[in-house]
Amino acid sequence: MSKPILGITMGDPFGNGPEITVRALNDKTVYDRCRPLVVGDMTSMAYALKVAKKVLGIDLTLNPVKDVKDAKFTYGTIDVLDMGLVPADKIPDTSDLDEPKPFGVGACALGGEASFQYVKKVIELAMAGEVDATCTNALSKEAINMAGHHYSGHTEIYADYTHTDKYTMMLAHEDLRVVHVSTHVSLREACDRVKKARVLECIRIANEGCKAIGIKEPKIGVAGLNPHCGENGMFGTEEIEEIQPAIDAALAEGINIPEKKPTPPDTVFSKALGGWYDIVVVMYHDQGHIPLKVKGFVYNKQEKHWEAVAGVNVTLGLPIIRASVDHGTGFGHAGSGHANELSLVNAMDYGIRLAENRKA
């Protein structure tokens, strides 16, 4: 089996994506498993490489290409499909200092337009079969909206440009995986979205998503919405009126839900970590994100930076493969050469595994 081609978006040019990408592609084992192609800008990647060489001693070269077939896919050379969207004079250059400083640009229309176009391009490549999987670095939701692209994140862009109606986000770190009934909406709206049809569809997608990464007989946990799953309607009726009927329908389809009922949100993740579930269906964004980030993120208060930023975001239900970092743009530190690449490494691993399983 040939190694899969991974299309990796650079992310916001003023965020941590370029330097994270350089760090991740400094690992030879990446090239042993896949053929990575960065979709972004040579100007940003060149600056990230210059800073990485100064801060970490990384010694790589860049190969600008206009087509996938022009890529070398050789360790030591990063192939960049150069979109030519970021002028060099827009990148604050402090690489001559002993300690390069963060860009300090933050969210802006230029960064939003560029990062949106990288995503659009990598989707086109995947839909055309020119790349086998896509991996995305962080973009700024504020920036892409400043540029006139009114989406709430990567997931919605992918759904729109692949014409997908039924999809959901899966977050994963090691043996903890979650999928969401709703994501980028207010908490008030998230409660309104807990409906039987949505919950059932997420259970189905979670089941298929686990199978796609090689779990043959997934065990699925379904979190309740309310404290103690509502205590038989005392603290809310969503569990009785919406979640339980969805579980009953899923069980009738042969999907394995060991509890056969919703599990209280404050215990469901401990059970998942103990191996009782392979994946948990959660009712809203933070219900799933908080446990994943408690497990995968480590903050060093002395150094005032993240020592570990682990985890991956996979969009399930798409006709193409998309895995992403599970963190933001890091505008406050981006450009200084101290970003952590672990989440991108995780995303690339998932992209490779999903591509291999799809080909098998």
Regions found by a protein language model. Name each.
Residues 156-165, 187-211:
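Active-site glycine-rich loop that binds ribose-phosphate moieties when present
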Residues 181, 316:
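Substrate-binding rim/cap in mid-to-C-terminal beta-strand-loop elements of soluble/periplasmic
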Residues 149-177, 183-186:
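Flexible loop/hinge segments that line or gate small-molecule binding clefts
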Residues 1-154, 199-221, 225-283, 287-312, ...:
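Contiguous, glycine/small-aliphatic-enriched amphipathic segments in soluble metabolic enzymes
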Residues 171, 313-315:
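Well-ordered beta-strand positions
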